[in-house]
Curated annotation (Swiss-Prot):
This protein's record includes keyword Transcription regulation: no
Keywords, alphabetical: ATP-binding, Isoprene biosynthesis, Kinase, Nucleotide-binding, Transferase
Full protein name: 4-diphosphocytidyl-2-C-methyl-D-erythritol kinase
Entry-linked SUPFAM superfamilies: GHMP Kinase, C-terminal domain, Ribosomal protein S5 domain 2-like
Lineage of producing organism: Bacteria, Pseudomonadati, Pseudomonadota, Alphaproteobacteria, Hyphomicrobiales
Reactions accelerated catalytically: 4-CDP-2-C-methyl-D-erythritol + ATP = 4-CDP-2-C-methyl-D-erythritol 2-phosphate + ADP + H(+)
EC number: 2.7.1.148
Length: 295
């Protein structure tokens, strides 16, 4: 473990649901899903350092919307790991969150922030805890946190906690667009007309831009129709992605962030610049996804 007491920064990658089928609902109300997800290089950043007392500050474009109380997932992650390890091994820390991802936007920003804090504090505190231990703590914080800890192409099933890594998955050129309309995940799930859809079809044996695009054409995001009914601006975001030349466009998660798939990173950058020039108040980011290889 790295025991450097100086500050270090961890990336909190955006989670993009390329496809998301809702396949059932448990007795406790949790929905069952079957989803292919990737994680982008663009996201939030978490800086951690040992300190005289616990401190939490937020900067970045979306900082004003971030709660600073104990309900924040960053602080929940800190406190959960401290309870697990014991206060004697977990001295005070300063946590600085750079919030670059929109709030309530369907890209797992809060869950990814929590995952970054768990990874970062495990190293800062030099804890003897493995990935499975962190995932167990992460699941107690939210169903998306374990997959955000993995941060590689994966298929998530169950409530999002049954994870299967996808090998030989190359990085993708992506453009993310959010029209500035927060969407309540609970409201989207409550508005679903059907909760017993079929699971995802088998993935192609060899995944490249073309095979993935063809596969995506026969999949869905089952949350998209409900989210569109709640926030019609999502349709405008998808329209702009298509106008900019996206090879495939869809809403991620429960929205309102949408993604466009592009064959190269340079094409994605040009498309993002075009959309940004027409919609300067929207969140628009060109990025690449993390591949299945170690990065």
């Amino acid at each position: 473990m790295d025991t450097d007491i100086g500050s270090r920064t961890w990336h909190a990658h955006a989670k993009i649901n390329l496809a998301l089928h809702v396949t059932g609902r448990r007795a406790d109300g949790y929905h069952l899903i079957d989803s292919l997800a990737v994680f982008t290089r663009f996201g939030d950043r978490v800086e951690i350092a040992l300190a005289d007392s616990d401190d939490f500050t937020v900067s970045g474009r979306y900082a004003p919307a971030v709660p600073l109380d104990a309900g924040n997932l960053v602080l929940k992650a800190r406190d959960a790991l401290r309870r697990e390890a014991g206060s004697g091994r977990t001295p005070p820390v300063s946590i600085k969150l750079e919030k670059n991802l929109p709030i309530a936007s369907g890209v797992g920003g809060g869950s990814s922030d929590a995952a970054a804090v768990l990874r970062g504090l495990a190293q800062t505190w030099a804890l003897d805890i493995d990935d499975a231990g962190l995932a167990r703590i992460g699941l107690s914080l939210g169903a998306d946190v374990p997959m955000c800890l993995a941060a590689k192409p994966l298929v998530a099933r169950g409530i999002g906690d049954e994870l299967s890594m996808v090998p030989d998955f190359s990085a993708l050129g992506l453009v993310l667009v959010n029209p500035g309309t927060p969407v309540s995940t609970a409201d989207v799930f409550a508005a679903l007309s059907r909760r017993d859809n079929e699971p995802l079809p088998p993935l192609p044996r060899s995944i490249d831009f073309h095979s993935l695009r063809n596969w995506l054409e026969v999949t869905r995001n089952d949350l998209e129709p409900a989210a569109l009914a709640l926030q019609p601006a999502i349709g405008r975001a998808l329209s702009w992605l298509n106008k900019a030349g996206s090879g495939f466009s869809r809403m991620s998660g429960s929205g309102a962030t949408c993604f466009g798939l592009f064959e190269t990173g340079n094409v994605a950058k040009r498309a993002a610049a075009e959309i940004r020039s027409r919609q300067p108040d929207w969140f628009v980011a060109a990025t690449r996804s993390m591949s299945s290889e170690a990065e």
